[in-house]
Amino acid sequence: MKIENILNKGADILKANKIVNPFLDAEILLSESIKKNKKHIILNPTEVLKRQHLNKFNKLIERRKKGEPVAYLINKKEFWKNEFYINKDVLIPRPDSELIIEQVLKIYSKDTQLQVLDVGT
């Protein structure tokens, strides 16, 4: 099956299951399945996937459609320009926390020594 077809099929499954960003999630999961970046997916829509990659993608789509977060499926999440390993034993960094950091950095000078504790917000 071609990249464009499997990507659309995956996005349709996620959309039917009320996943908020179905196409983006499908792209991320496909990228993880074939171990190629998003650019490769966009530039090679007619590339035929190997069965092993298709099977991995389908398994990830099945888990995602049940509501499992993408970060847990791919075991990584970017936060504050860094990539972190994620699994079910840790909380997923949220964009709201990045916003808080940005606001704090606007208020305090770079020379200010801060100590911050974020307890499961």
Predicted segment positions?
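SAM-dependent Rossmann-like transferase core, predominantly class I methyltransferases
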Residues: 51-121
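N-terminal auxiliary segments of SAM/dcSAM-dependent transferases
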Residues: 1-74
